[in-house]
Amino acid sequence: MTRAVIFDMDGLLTDSERIGVSGIQACGRLQGLDIPEAFILQTLGATSAHSGALYRANFPGIDVVRLFEDFRVYMHGKAERGEIPLKKGALALLDALDARGVPCAVASSSMRETVRLYLDKAGVLGRFAAVVTGGGRLPSKPAPDIFLEAARHLGVMPAHCLALEDSANGVRAGRAAGMRVGMVPDLIPFSPALAPYCDFVADDLSRVIPLL
């Protein structure tokens, strides 16, 4: 029985990953860099510390601090203008969880300021009992720490939690946390390699409701 649901944010609750890919590429061009989409997809679900190390290893001379600050300004501007919408089915699933009295949390590798801004501007921040973020304090997904911390805040054993994710790093983190895991793919499609980490795959968040 699902006693709590823990959501990733980017690409799962909010349609921010698609916007973020073009954003990081635009910010890279400010430094004369052409950052391939395929590389950016490898960083999805990772903390800024972890993804920053990947950028430094692959783009010698890059100013990662500047890149991430330019990106933060770009994305926060989008959020403030209401240009980062919720993903399809998000409200329907949150309504279903409310109706059943199932608490939910957000477990995101993004910075806390960013997570709270996106959720607030999307009108759903108050619907989560806990918001747990990476931001360098906790190990990056696929480590389970962010999910485990969210479960602790909810007071629910990990085995009774459903982790919802859209990325490879995310589903691995949910499985490592000992949770039931559902994947709702966004930019990264489901593949057989991810099957060991997923209990089910859904086309959008509303399709999760009958699987609770």
Report each predicted region and the residues it spans.
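Helix-loop "lid/cap" segments that line or gate small-molecule binding pockets
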Residues: 27-28, 47-61, 118, 150-151
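Conserved SAM-binding loop
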Residues: 13, 86, 104-107, 163-164
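Metal-dependent phosphoesterase signature
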Residues: 54-92, 100
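Active-site neighborhood of HAD-like aspartate-dependent phosphohydrolases
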Residues: 1-42
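Short beta->alpha linker loops
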Residues: 19, 46-47, 85-89, 110, ...
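Asp-based, Mg2+/Mn2+-dependent phosphohydrolase catalytic module
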Residues: 1-3, 95-98, 111-212
